[in-house]
Amino acid sequence: MSWQTYVDEHLMCEIDGQHLTAAAIIGHDGSIWAQSESFPQVKSEQITGVMNDFAEPGSLAPTGLFLGDNKYMVIQGEPGAVIRGKKGSGGVTIKKTNMALIVGIYDEPMTPGQCNMVVERLGDYLYDQGF
């Protein structure tokens, strides 16, 4: 299965009639493995900041989490495993696996819990597969 298939069928899937706004699978080095058409153009330093926050939880909190031109307020996640951000009525969930970051961006009416479930379920599966 291609990485794009994981994005299209497992991240951008329908959950209770709702979909993520955008999603991507990004290597720890910042390389894009696959992304939805709507995923923002991220800068390498933004991925470096995310990786630093996984290594030192809380390092993004003072500045916020940036993905492309969007700034998210960092909210409670799981140190070293999941980063969550909020922006208005939407937000982002980032799950770290052995080799990649699974990123899901949502907006109302999708809920944070639905986004977390979609992103973390795929992240846990890929982690268990060695990715």
UniProtKB/Swiss-Prot annotation:
Gene Ontology molecular functions: actin monomer binding
Cellular component terms (Gene Ontology): cell cortex; cytoskeleton
PANTHER family per the UniProt record, alphabetical: PROFILIN, PROFILIN-2
The entry's keywords: Actin-binding, Cytoplasm, Cytoskeleton
Annotated signal peptide: none
SUPFAM superfamilies: Profilin (actin-binding protein)
Quaternary state and interactors: Occurs in many kinds of cells as a complex with monomeric actin in a 1:1 ratio.
Function per UniProt: Binds to actin and affects the structure of the cytoskeleton. At high concentrations, profilin prevents the polymerization of actin, whereas it enhances it at low concentrations. By binding to PIP2, it inhibits the formation of IP3 and DG.
Family of this protein: Belongs to the profilin family.
Compartments, record wording: Cytoplasm, Cytoskeleton
Protein name, entry field: Profilin-2
InterPro entries linked to this entry: PFN, PFN_euk, PFN_sf, Profilin_CS
Keyword Chloroplast appears in the UniProt entry: no
